[in-house]
Amino acid sequence: MRWIFRSGGLGAVGLMLVAVGARFATAANLPVGSLGVTPAAQGEYGTIKGRLVWGGSDVPPARALIEKGRAQKDPEICAREAAIPNRELVVDPKTKGVVSGFAYLVKPKGSNPGAVKELLTRSPKAELDQKNCEFLPYVLAIHQDQTLVIKSSDPVNHNVRYAAFANSPFNQIMAPKGEIEVKLVAERRPIVVACDIHSWMKAYIMVFDHPFFAVTGADGAFEIKGVPAGEQNLVLWQERVGYVGFTDPAKKAQGRAVTIRAGEVTDLGSVAIDPAQVK
């Protein structure tokens, strides 16, 4: 049997049991839905792309969070074969691209219902794994119509804990090779997911009620397709910096204005992180 939790608002976490069903596609940080807006006319969509890059001359070196063989808890599993990397700020030394940043629209004007059907058909569930005593992926963007599957590939106990704004607090023991399903509603900010048994473990989940979001790749690149034409507000967020590339510091959570033209690609080029802003 598999536990399914439904979380939202101020109510208590609901719960029910269902039989284990079919397996699911790997989660993708691609458009999957849109709510509460008037659909754009067919073909009136464009694409936003760009790269989140390190703005300093010296690239921060890769660092270990837990050195090989040095885990304080469950060392027979955690960091036994290799060090657990520090993923808070990872910069590609060749391209200066910054991985694992969120790129998304704030209060998008318009919708793309075709993208909803396409991605929910292909990937109705998104997955967060506890593997080798770390959460993978470290950063995950999902739509609230997807089911979040949190599982453990490890043969040791973990737990899953988060406290959010729109979703009820959650804290659940994860047995070895265990699995739970969670339904989340949209949040304005990333949710921090932690394991208290292994205090170094964490991940970030951003939940949207629209389809216009992405996560930056290994070279810092991001692309959001199917965006309704017109002026939109784009936000870039990275764990160690917070909001990036905003035009008005007083409204940094609103991002920057971007004009989308139907059938065209709006290329923002490189959006640089100022090293002085790293926390």
Predicted regions and their residues:
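Extracytoplasmic copper-binding redox domains, predominantly the cupredoxin/blue-copper superfamily
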Residues: 25-279
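N-terminal secretory signal peptides that target proteins for export/translocation
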Residues: 1-6
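Bacterial N-terminal signal peptides
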Residues: 9-23
